[in-house]
Curated annotation (Swiss-Prot):
Keywords: Acyltransferase, Glutathione biosynthesis, Glycoprotein, Hydrolase, Membrane, Signal-anchor, Transferase, Transmembrane, Transmembrane helix, Zymogen. It comes from Rattus norvegicus (Rat). The lineage of its organism: Eukaryota, Metazoa, Chordata, Craniata, Vertebrata. This is Glutathione hydrolase 6. The keyword Secreted does not apply. It is a single-pass type II membrane protein. Hydrolyzes and transfers gamma-glutamyl moieties from glutathione and other gamma-glutamyl compounds to acceptors. Cleaved by autocatalysis into a large and a small subunit and the autocatalytic cleavage is essential to the functional activation of the enzyme. One of its GO terms (molecular function) is leukotriene C4 gamma-glutamyl transferase activity. It catalyses: an N-terminal (5-L-glutamyl)-[peptide] + an alpha-amino acid = 5-L-glutamyl amino acid + an N-terminal L-alpha-aminoacyl-[peptide]; glutathione + H2O = L-cysteinylglycine + L-glutamate; an S-substituted glutathione + H2O = an S-substituted L-cysteinylglycine + L-glutamate. Its EC number is 3.4.19.13, 2.3.2.2. InterPro entries: Gamma-glutamyltransfase, GGT_ssub, Ntn_hydrolases_N.
Length: 498
């Protein structure tokens, strides 16, 4: 190097890892700055001025830096092997220094009443499935582990927004039909299969495999199921949900339902959409000593109802769900600018509640699926089919709207694909349409920064136990190319994502 060469300029070298984004730069500056300052101090010492063997100093510094890094890594590996927690394998480095608050994910997320089913939904997402695959898989899982609130005998409503097409589609249950007085016709399998056929990505059999395995090998009674069993008693539910002495199973007890597993595996082999649900129906009528009904379940996919708002476009389900009532309430609420956001919580705290279940899946591109289902009462009819392990609903054939079903999606601006999206779906909330209207009004009148604070305050660890009652409101948000999930009350519904 010539003596005329200018001063050496040191530049910060930033470590790059897959998945890191621009938000990481601030954190990396804090880590890198002390190192850069130290190098600059050495550069300015008398022995390191131009003409003072700068090349030698540079090589020496590089050697010392490499030695320090290698020594540090070796020490960390040695500490890992000698850790009192045992051999944890290679040092666990975070995939990214870009951190999020709980419930915020780069790609996709699922939130449901059961930790097992939220994990199953996440597995389907990671396996290449979309939000419909994850939602349908989680719903089938809930049919196994939460028989008090949903199941193959339940009625399903859903709302799906496709970010690629910009279309929103409603899954409708069709008119309520009965097998016998007090026993509703099961429609869950035809409804979920219809939704998956049109919008899913993974094979139908793939979605049924894990729920069938849970039913066959067993699952733990979680807090919501244990609470429902304690309140319900055991009449009609033994031996599946009872101890040998006839008392109901408690928290942590193991349940196996091999007959339900067999039904799910048979349905996985259905050769055509028209045959989905037939295996279950044939076994049920045999159990009950009935003939096959002449009218088959008629779930359908229909365009969602739409309402233009100053803030964007609202989508919800058509009648006989509570969607039309929700639309009317929103129009009057937004015009009168009432109720006060503070009054929303009172709508979520009512003694008498319908029994239902809800889940939501979302991805960072804006696609989302909201599903809600009901057996009408806790454990439905209370009649456990011996050959199928299925509990039928006690829904009656009538024209009364499904007041528990009014999922909604707010698309911020159809002309801006980067705008925020919001999805809301409730379970067990009386006056559901009013509660949803109030919650949406709160969202529309709250500044964006305050919404972020509220979302963060609603989060608890994903494995939070069942600390809430039957009422829950699930919220999914797409903001800044991230998927966010939360619940009210906070922490009552486990979530997973990646």
């Amino acid at each position: 190097m010539d003596a005329t060469t200018g001063a050496v300029l040191y530049q910060k070298l930033q470590l790059w890892e897959p998945g890191m984004e621009s938000e990481e730069e601030e954190e990396e500056e804090e880590i890198a700055e002390p190192l850069v300052l130290s190098l600059r101090r050495l550069q300015n010492t008398p022995g390191n001025k131009v003409g003072g063997l700068p090349g030698a100093w540079t090589r020496l510094l590089a050697g010392l830096l490499l030695l320090a890094v290698s020594s540090s890594l070796a020490l960390r590996q040695l500490q890992g092997r000698n850790s009192p927690k045992g051999n944890l394998g290679p040092v666990d480095l975070p995939a990214s220094r870009h951190s999020h608050h709980p419930g915020v994910y780069h790609h996709s997320a699922v939130i449901s009443p059961a930790a097992t089913c939220s994990r199953l939904g996440q597995e389907l997402l990671v396996a290449g499935g979309n939000v419909v695959d994850a939602g349908v898989g989680a719903a089938l899982c809930l049919a196994v582990v939460h028989p008090h609130a949903t199941g193959l005998g339940a009625t399903f409503w859903g709302l799906f927004y496709n970010s690629s097409s910009g279309n929103s589609t409603a899954l409708t249950a069709g008119p309520a039909q009965i097998l016998a007085p007090g026993l509703g016709l099961p429609t869950a399998l035809p409804a979920l299969h219809l939704l998956h056929t049109h919008f899913g990505r993974l094979p139908w059999s793939h979605l049924l495999a894990k729920p069938a395995m849970l039913a066959q090998k067993g699952f733990e009674v979680d807090a919501p199921l244990a609470s429902a069993l304690a309140a319900q008693g055991t009449e009609g539910l033994c031996p599946l949900f009872c101890h040998t002495n006839g008392t109901p199973l408690g928290l942590g007890a193991q349940v196996t339902n091999p007959n339900l597993a067999a039904v799910l595996l048979r349905e996985a082999l259905a050769s055509s959409p028209d045959l989905v649900g037939n295996a279950l129906l044939n076994l049920l009528v045999r159990d009950l000593g009935l003939e096959l009904p002449s009218v088959q379940p008629k779930p359908s996919l229909e365009p969602a109802l739409q309402l233009l708002l100053p803030q964007g476009v609202l989508f919800t389900t058509p009648g006989p769900s509570a969607g039309p009532e929700l639309m009317g309430l929103l129009e009057s609420t937004l015009h009168s600018k009432t109720p006060s956001p503070a009054s929303c919580s009172s709508l979520l705290q009512t003694a008498e509640t319908p029994v239902s279940s809800a889940l939501a899946t979302v991805d960072s591109h804006g696609s989302m699926l909201l599903l809600t289902s009901s057996l009408n009462s806790s454990f439905g009819s209370g009649h456990l089919s011996p050959s199928t392990g299925v509990l039928l609903s006690n829904l009656e054939a009538s024209s009364v709207p499904s007041t528990w079903a009014c999922p909604l999606i707010l698309r911020g601006n159809l002309d801006d694909t980067e705008d925020d999206m919001l999805g809301l779906v409730a379970s067990g909330i009386p006056r559901g349409a009013k509660a949803m209207a109030c919650t949406l009004f709160n969202h529309l009148t709250t500044p964006q920064t305050q919404q972020q604070v509220q979302h963060q305050a609603q989060q608890r660890p994903t494995e939070s136990p069942g600390i809430c009652g039957k009422e829950a409101l699930l919220q999914v948000v797409v903001h800044a190319e991230h998927a966010q999930v939360s619940s009210i009350p906070s922490g009552c519904c486990p979530f997973q994502g990646y």
